[in-house]
């Protein structure tokens, strides 16, 4: 499990507005603190956010957060919930579960009234509010979460124990039974506002060190630090070896090998690609372009040069293409009839059977070096399918794979309702790909009556516009799809 400290500061952050103390003037990045928040990435890749601070947008850009599986809130104070509206770019099209006590959920409903009213304001985040009760464990993703009762002065709030890690912020007091529960922790995030001067609702650093000792001296990270805490470098000199001065961008990794504390390093893609929107282009011209890019990439590999990866998006005039293993009997009219309709048939080197390309369809041709991405051909095809599945989910459509057939389908397991929304057929040589996918956006589906699409006579074909009952902004859909490609392939 990875724990990334997105923010390590108290409610005012550091530097504090209007303050000129030496901590606020420090040029050490470790002394610059946004409001406290923690991102957990599970071994299965699920992402859980603890508290959503007013600095979430800045923190998310730093950490490359583009999806979350759940949000856990400790209490309703603004420095812990002020970033909830910024979740809109992550969950405007699918629900995100937010876990908190009932009084916190009520506060959120009041604060974000425009989100939860009968007719929500367009584009607001889809938040599913889930009640949590102290000492009643619940499941989030692949983890068991144990809520713990702690006191924030007179205000009862929650801490969270997740496996062998615990997160306690804004705590002043904790009961003996909760201390006992924490003794199995190997990693603890715990608040310490300032070194020694008493505060009515927060622990001091000295008190935090004492609490850590009561728990059994697990590896610990101090959080929710103010500008009255020591400078980071001075702090390192006075803290015991197992207690770390938290800072924005600290990462703690906990596994069977132990616990490692390090600087978080934002993910860098193994390989970028060049994107080219070819607009409306004849199929033959696009085929010539991809073949040139493909042969240039293969030649680069033969000369031990790094090939350039290219993603082409095209929109074609009506045309039919037949893969190298396709069956001409799946063309339901003669070539002379095709000619009379001014539709050309191309025999091409991709896999798959016969399909149609035409206006309103995004035809994508990735010329990618799969070795740069560290994947094989099967994983690549699954990645193409996943990109389409992720895109159409934005429109509320559930895309799925179908056993024994490539592409993306709707209702693949319901006889008589199965329909294909995206066809996939590729060629690969020396791990370089060409051809790709055809996604029906505003496509005239009558053309598919001329063929058994992809060799199937018992399955239908659909488009995004057919499913939603209205034409889509084609340019916007292309932009959204390219962003999905950039995210998914960039994560490899």
Swiss-Prot record:
UniProt site (Lowers pKa of active site Cys): 420
Coiled coil: none
EC number: 2.3.1.181
Catalytic activity: octanoyl-[ACP] + L-lysyl-[protein] = N(6)-octanoyl-L-lysyl-[protein] + holo-[ACP] + H(+)
Region feature Unknown, mapped onto this chain: 1-255
Chief localisation class: cytoplasm
Binding site for substrate: 350-357, 423-425, 436-438
Gene3D superfamilies found in the cross-reference section: Bira Bifunctional Protein, Domain 2 (3.30.930.10), Ribonuclease Z/Hydroxyacylglutathione hydrolase-like (3.60.15.10)
Cited CDD domains: LipB (cd16444), metallo-hydrolase-like_MBL-fold (cd16279)
This protein's record includes keyword Transmembrane helix: no
UniProt keyword Membrane present: no
GO BP of this protein: protein modification process
Pathway(s) per entry: Protein modification; protein lipoylation via endogenous pathway; protein N(6)-(lipoyl)lysine from octanoyl-[acyl-carrier-protein]: step 1/2
InterPro entries tied to this protein: aa-tRNA-synth_II/BPL/LPL (IPR045864), BPL_LPL_catalytic (IPR004143), Metallo-B-lactamas (IPR001279), Octanoyltransferase (IPR000544), Octanoyltransferase_CS (IPR020605), RibonucZ/Hydroxyglut_hydro (IPR036866)
One GO cellular component term noted in the UniProt record for this chain: cytoplasm
UniProt-listed PANTHER family: OCTANOYLTRANSFERASE
Note, other: In the reaction, the free carboxyl group of octanoic acid is attached via an amide linkage to the epsilon-amino group of a specific lysine residue of lipoyl domains of lipoate-dependent enzymes.
Family: In the C-terminal section; belongs to the LipB family.
NCBIfam families: lipB, PRK02113.1, PRK14345.1
Protein name: Octanoyltransferase
The organism of origin for this protein: Porphyromonas gingivalis (strain ATCC BAA-308 / W83)
Lineage: Bacteria, Pseudomonadati, Bacteroidota, Bacteroidia, Bacteroidales
Gene label: lipB
